[in-house]
UniProtKB/Swiss-Prot annotation:
Similarity comment: Belongs to the UPF0102 family.
Source organism of this protein record: Granulibacter bethesdensis (strain ATCC BAA-1260 / CGDNIH1)
Gene3D superfamilies (UniProt xref): 3.40.1350.10
Molecular function terms, GO-annotated: nucleic acid binding
InterPro entries, alphabetized: Restrct_endonuc-II-like, tRNA_endonuc-like_dom_sf, UPF0102_YraN-like
Domain of life of the source: Bacteria
Database matches in SUPFAM superfamilies: Restriction endonuclease-like
Name of the molecule in the record: UPF0102 protein GbCGDNIH1_0975
């Protein structure tokens, strides 16, 4: 498998994966122009991800990546604090309760597969553990974080 060195934080990823945007020195690089296209739902989702990333940073998390696409699936936000890696799924819905119920079993499995892929490429991530969080954002911009939304012992590694 060919690897490419991405100029987003020097991450070396297999050539079939793309970091669509990464924070580095307060800049965001857009690598996938498809992200910039789309309708209102796409724009709302991007805004929800921006709000979620800001909330994580305000709580002391380092954002390692946003909209990480792999052949196994996509991770909305990859964040780390004190060696704990958070794989974060962001959901935007009209109300917080609707957003909280928007992560089904198939999507959890894809998220786990994508996390497995990233961890295989970057074993230095998550030295103190890995957890799966969901951040829900409603139309009013209210944010709710569900930490440890699900566990691997419930789903298992792929």
């Amino acid at each position: 498998m060919n690897k490419k060195k991405d100029d987003c934080g020097g991450l070396s990823l297999p050539s079939d994966s793309v970091f669509c945007s990464l924070h580095a020195n307060d800049s965001i690089w857009q690598h996938d122009k498809k992200v910039l296209r789309g309708g209102k739902a796409s724009r709302d989702g991007l805004e929800a991800e921006r709000i979620a990333a800001q909330a994580l940073e305000a709580d002391g998390w380092q954002i390692l990546g946003r909209r990480l696409r792999t052949s196994a699936g996509e991770i909305d936000i990859l964040a780390e604090m004190d060696g704990l890696l958070a794989i974060v799924e962001v959901k935007y819905r009209p109300t917080l309760s609707e957003a909280a119920h928007a992560l089904g079993p198939r999507q959890r499995k894809r998220l786990i597969a994508a996390a497995s892929y990233v961890l295989a490429q970057h074993p230095e991530y998550g030295t103190e553990g890995v957890r799966f969080d969901v951040i829900v954002v409603d139309m009013a911009g209210q944010v709710r974080r569900i930490t440890d939304a699900f566990r691997l012992d419930e789903e298992g590694w792929p």
